[in-house]
Design a protein with these regions (language model features):
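Mg2+-dependent endonuclease catalytic cores in nucleic-acid-processing enzymes, primarily RNase H-like
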Residues: 1-117
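Acidic two-metal-ion nuclease catalytic site recognized across multiple nuclease folds
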Residues: 102-103, 107-158
């Protein structure tokens, strides 16, 4: 519930609609529910809560090149989310802090191509077998880039 409190505290700093992407699986479901309650109680109409099912299906959206669909490139939602970060960095839509831990998390996770030619990130269980901790910070960045095309990130901060 720390995330819910932080979202409510930080909310007034921003203008326009505020998109809060939450991994809605497991513990995140409670955060999503509580934020929805507070949004209704406090009449926070600018807050848009986006539940993301990291275990769900990859969207059928057309990618930036207009030729391929995300579901034809990425095997699962987590791989797709990480792909949105890669795309945003390549297009210079976002930049990351010089954070050694974050860089390590983004660069230590292996990937492979499936028999259907789709990209698949190494699972957290496979990472653990290699002695690597869960890439929680990288996952948070990936989650924050989800649906990046629905709004201009620069319009949110004063």
């Amino acid at each position: 519930m720390q995330l819910y409190r932080q979202a409510i505290t930080e909310f007034p700093r921003y203008r326009g609609k505020i998109y809060i992407n939450i991994d809605d699986c497991g513990l995140g479901g409670g955060v999503t529910d509580r934020l929805e309650e507070v949004k209704q109680e406090e009449k926070l109409t600018r807050m848009v809560i986006v539940p993301v099912n990291a275990a769900g299906k990859v969207p059928e959206e057309t990618l930036g090149d207009g030729k391929q669909k995300a579901c034809d490139i990425y095997d699962n939602m987590t791989t797709y989310l990480w792909g949105t970060v890669k795309d945003a960095l390549m297009m210079e839509e976002v930049s990351l802090e010089n954070d050694n831990e974050l860089v390590a998390q983004f660069t230590c996770r292996k990937y492979r191509l499936t028999s259907r030619g789709k990209m698949l990130l190494e699972s957290k269980e496979e990472m653990k077998k290699r002695g690597i901790d869960s890439p929680d910070r990288a996952d948070a960045v990936a989650l924050s880039c989800y649906q990046k095309k629905t709004f201009n990130i620069g319009s949110l901060v004063d």
